[in-house]
Amino acid sequence: MKTLRARFKKTEGQDWGKSDQRLLQAVENNDVARVASLIAHKGLVPTKLDPEGKSAFHLAAMRGAAGCLEVMLAQGADVMSTDGAGYNALHLAAKYGHPECLKQLLEASCVVDIEDSSGWTALHHAAAGGCLSCSKLLCSFKAHMNPRDRSGATPLIIAAQMCHTDLCRLLLQQGAATNDQDLQGRTALMLACEGGSPETVEVLLQGGAQLSITDALGQDATHYGALTGDKLILQLLHESARRSSPPSASLEEDSGEASSQNSVSSHEKQGAPKKRKAPQPPASTPVPDDRDAYEEIVRLRQERGRLLQKIRGLEQHKERRRKEPLEAEASSVHSLERQVQELQQMLAEKQEEKESLGREVESLQSRLSLLENERENTSYDVATLQDEEGEMPDFPGADALMPKNQSPSAEEIVASLQEQVAQLTRQNQELLEKVQILEEFEKDEAQMAEESQAEVVPLVLYESLRAELEQLRRQYTEAMHSQQQQQEGEPPRAQEGEETAYQEIKDKGITIQNGPSVPDLNGTTYAETKANGMELQAGGSKGVWNTEAGVSEAAPIEPEAAGSEATGKDRLAAKEMDTSATMAEALNVKALGDNAESEPVAAEDTGGKENPGMKADEVDVLAQAGLTGTVIRNMEAIGVRDTGIQATGLEAKAVKTTGVQATVAEVIGVKVTGVQTTAIEAIGVKDTTQVATGAQADCWQATEADCTGAQDTAMEPTGAQATVTETTEAETSGTEDPCAAILHPGAAAAALQAELETRIRGLEEALRRREREAAAELEAARGRFAEAEEAARGRSRELEALRELLATATATGERARTEAAELRQALAASEARVAELSSTVDAAREELERMRGASVPADEHEHALSALRDHVTRLQAQLADLARRHEKTSAEVFQITDLSKEVFTLKEALKVQQSTPASSKEEEALRGQVTALQQQIQEEAREHGAVVALYRTHLLYAIQGQMDEDVQCILSQILQMQRLQAQGR
């Protein structure tokens, strides 16, 4: 079954509206004008409870909003209303320490001793909160000093338990009972000893607290002090026990029992509407003789020493409290700053390490690619030069040709080749730089999560190389097709000339063998051949194959075969002049074609297409000059080899995508990009120096040219060089006649065709292997890049963790600074407390000095004590007389009351009689009776005034001392009779 309060709360909670919420909000904001407006215009009730059990009126008392509380009281708010917890506004104001609100409520006729749901009064709340001003205000409004809550605790017990020394002193001065006990038998002194407050213990001992009182367990205050372990408290208790004497102890016990009985009786009667008795003065211990006075002086000196010691201890404690927070704060701040610096340093080191690792990875990648390219270039160049310069000729007569091979022109050719190798190395370096730029671009793109773009550059390069390879193959096919058409154009002539030349060589074989030696013939023709070679070089013959050398070789064959050396020389000179003029024109045309092309690929196309035409022009020129069919067939064979070697060089160039491909093409002697080397010219010079007058010398020279061309062509490490060498040796050894290769160009072309197909297959295989290697390198590079990216992400995560740690350290530093500020505030509060304690000590010193000055001699004290005893005896006699006179006065008062009633009835009767005629005798009798009664009333009034004056005198005496309960009852009756008399009048 619900209680009435619960129902009331539920009803009010249901009626709670927005206006009530606005009023509550205005009180929270302490908006006095808003509160007044809402109450006046809306008609709101300030004491209405919300669903949580609080109202605007109670909130104003709790928050200390004195202005809002004044407005609500002016609007007629119920002062005695309680909130959901059972507190009224007076309890809340005392609990939260708002003396202004407390004064307003007390002036508004709020009951000062009303209890809350736990039995606490406003003084209990003020004692628990330690509010000295609120306690003084309640004492000034005659609050009961010894009310008990449900646990039997009084305000003094609560103040002692909370160690509020000043509040205990105030309550003792206002007459609070020192030795009252709660339901557990504990006194204020026991709780002060338990709380460890020597100041509170000292105040209670000075107020008359007894050490012999025990609690429900039989433990006294000394036991509580021993449990605390405070030496100062134990010293105070021992001194108080030693100082107390039996007479004084009995007197204190009597006074304590009387005060306890009075407090209990007053607590039992506090519900009755009776007047409050006068407050009891604090008990004091009288000094019976000089010995007690001497002991008092000694005690005061000891107390002074204790106070000085306490002052020094407080000063030391203050200094220690002042230094400890500063040192702790400084150490914590230094440690936090050091941590922040370490974290920042670690962060900088991690960033530097990340940057250095990134740079190292990039440098290693670039260096690796550079070293690989340089290794390939160097190994290829060294192998090429070793194959070109280190191999010795294997054919007969090589020893005779060696001194002539080491000519100044050959050294110049080697120097030019070295310069070209250096130029190609520089170009290779530039290409490597471009590749490095492309790799950096790919790395930047990969960081933007576009990994697909990393394959763009290699795929484009691969497609371009494939297209270039297909184009070169088409050029090679066209060149072969044009050559076949050229060969098919003169089959009878070639065949006929072949048979004629072969027959002539067969007929004149003995003459050739018996003729001059090979060195002599070489010496005869070397000067002319060298001259022709120098003219070809001066004429800008870069990019042209050694057709001129073949012409100069084939030209002296017919004159020498005829046996007339002089005639042969003349004819040779004439034919060389014609051939030189014709070839000069062809070379000029070729040079103009090479200069007109700016791009390397275009130059390659031009060189590939013009070469067969040039071969045809050369054949026509030689035919017009009167050359034989044998010379033409030799040129055609040379042209076939030229075309095959050129196509092979183009294929090799298509395979090589780096700077090595240029080196291969230049070493073989095929320059279709506009940069023509003189390697083939060197071969032509070698061929020219090896010309013989007989068919055997021509065959050996052709064989040497074939071997040299095959050696220069097969520069790839795929075994093509060995294949060409074996093919040449097979042709040389398998031919019974040394001139068979010259006389059968169709078979040589077929052999070259097969050789070229073999080389093409080898180059395609090398291309596929190169593609696989490039793909593997690309995958490895991607793996390295992925590892570097993962490492970068790991470092990024570490960096983020370090940043978070730095933020945490910064926040910790901020909290430490905040705590330091709070510690400073606490230090300031402690300093203020110390200052307050210092002022208290000064006041104690002044009081001590005043007590010293107020001490009187023992005789004067004895005389004053006897005078006081006589005065007490007289007062007791006067009180007994007053009681007797009071009884008499009470009877007289009742008589006066009866007489007053009779006078009143007589007056009424007179009024009635005045309206009706009566006899004169009756009228006179009545008048005489009235006069007598008036005189009697005057006499009684004089006596009553004397009684009242005596009562006032005794009341003044009672204010200064103790008034008994019976005297108080008599005085109450007298006052009641006075009120009745006033009403009767």
From Swiss-Prot:
InterPro entries for this protein: Ankyrin_rpt (IPR002110), Ankyrin_rpt-contain_sf (IPR036770), RAI14/UACA (IPR042420)
Phenotype of null mutants: Deficient mice exhibit progressive hearing loss. Loss of Ankrd24 induces morphological changes in hair bundles, early postnatal hair bundles are warped. Stereocilia of deficient mice show diminished recovery of auditory function after noise damage and increased susceptibility to overstimulation of the hair bund.
Keyword set, alphabetical order: ANK repeat, Cell membrane, Cell projection, Coiled coil, Membrane, Repeat
Expression across tissues: Expressed in vestibular hair bundles.
GO cellular component: plasma membrane; stereocilium
Entries under SMART domains matching the protein: ANK
Annotated stretches, region: Disordered: 243-293, 311-360, 386-412, 476-503, 594-614
Record's subcellular location: Cell membrane; Cell projection, Stereocilium
GO function terms (MF aspect): actin binding
Gene Ontology biological-process entries: auditory receptor cell stereocilium organization; sensory perception of sound
Coiled-coil regions listed: 291-488
Biased composition (Basic and acidic residues): 311-326, 349-360
ANK repeats: 52-81, 85-114, 118-147, 151-180, 184-213
Stored Pfam families: Ank, Ank_2, Ank_3
Alphabetized PROSITE patterns for the sequence: ANK_REP_REGION (PS50297), ANK_REPEAT (PS50088)
PANTHER family associated with the record: ANKYCORBIN, DUF3447 DOMAIN-CONTAINING PROTEIN
Role played: Component of the stereocilia rootlet in hair cells of inner ear. Bridges the apical plasma membrane with the lower rootlet and maintains normal distribution of TRIOBP, thereby reinforcing stereocilia insertion points and organizing rootlets for hearing with long-term resilience.
Subunit structure: Homodimer. Interacts (via C-terminal domain) with TRIOBP (via C-terminal domain) isoform 4; recruits TRIOBP isoform 4 to stereocilia rootlets.
Protein name in UniProt: Ankyrin repeat domain-containing protein 24
